Amino acid sequence: MKLNPVLNKYTNAPLSLSLKRLQECSARSFELASPAPPEINHSVDFYNHEQNRIFNQEWICIGRCDEIPTAGDFLTHDIAGTSVLIVRQESNAIMGFINACAHRFTCLTSEKLGHAFAFTCPNHAWTYGINGQLNHAPFMEMKSSFNKNDNNLERLHTEVWEGFIYVTLSKNPKKGIAESLEMLSKNIVGQYDMTDYKTIIRESMNWNANWKNLIENFTESYHVPIAHPKTFANHKKRIQDYECGEDSEHYCYHFAPQESENGPGAAHKDNKNLKGKWRRTMVDFCIFPNHLVTLMPDYLWWVSVMPKGVGEFKATWGVAVPQDILNDIAEEDHDNWVMEKIEYMNTANEEDRELVERLHQGSQSIRLPKGAYHPIEKNLWQFMKYLTKITA
């Protein structure tokens, strides 16, 4: 569904009004709560504010460690208009840099994934090692005050958690991502051993909606039996069995077991980590602000959502599977098997796209009812409380 950008009564809502409305909504208990105010999904002032408070400051997931397994492997990602470059080092560490030459700030590479022994600026051939140090700057000896050591790439803070790579544009992040997510790992997702999952797909998509519309769609499974008849509904999880996790400033999650203990959605027979109901349980979680994961015993699907405007976002997504699942796929069948996974996920994405774009369209209406939450939509309320605090 293609939506044309439109001006509505919320477009020019002043930041003060959006913040006030958000504060009022999030102050209510979950039992009395209503959905987030439409201003925060349509106001240009609020959009600019969240770019500064959220995407220029918070930890952002940009991919998986196994996507860059070898020294010199790299990936790039755009965060709020800033291109970042993530490179595997000789030491096996992962380092992050601003993807801009230290001379006059030309982007060093436009490749999304690649391998390099050095990065050479296409403008004036300044050349950097994979550690970001300037190795060569043609004819700069003509300037007596020039010092190569003062002209390295701008370094970024990076961290790895459960096989995911996170980066922040903040010079002084308040808290590390691993520390923030310690209890989520310990109590819920650590038992799945996500570091053992191997990436088989990395794609991206652009949708015509506010980025928060997708966060809300992903963090509730109330819609799944109705909206996903060709995909996720087939796992047959009962709405009554969903449980929402504890309140946290850093994440939210919900989980439910599927009906079958075998086949798609269930653990491989060689999986020794998962016990009891967890061998057939899905966990949907969001690492605030924009990292979404559906975690199952036989695969995970991750999404990193990046706004491109009030009514448009880009979502980078990938699929990874445990090694024991891969071991059962014959080499000659691998490509067809991956294509089937891509087709399945594309179908699921299309099922969601119309919902998300309709949500954005409907919420710009000049008159709206109060709205309400279903009991298994608590994650939306938790996300709203995070937004309230981070944008205050």
PLM feature spans:
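N-terminal pre-ligand scaffold of iron-sulfur
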Residues: 2-100, 104-111, 157-159
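Short Pro/Gly-enriched beta-strand edge/turn motifs at strand-loop
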Residues: 56-68, 137-141, 285-289
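Short, flexible segments with low predicted structural confidence
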Residues: 18-26, 129-130, 184-187, 276-277
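C-terminal catalytic domain of Rieske-type non-heme iron oxygenases
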Residues: 2-5, 93, 99, 159, ...
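N-terminal short leaders/motifs
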Residues: 15-44, 106-122, 154-160, 232-265
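Rieske [2Fe-2S] iron-sulfur-binding domain
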Residues: 67-171, 175-182
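Short linear motifs in intrinsically disordered
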Residues: 62-70, 146-148, 280-285, 318
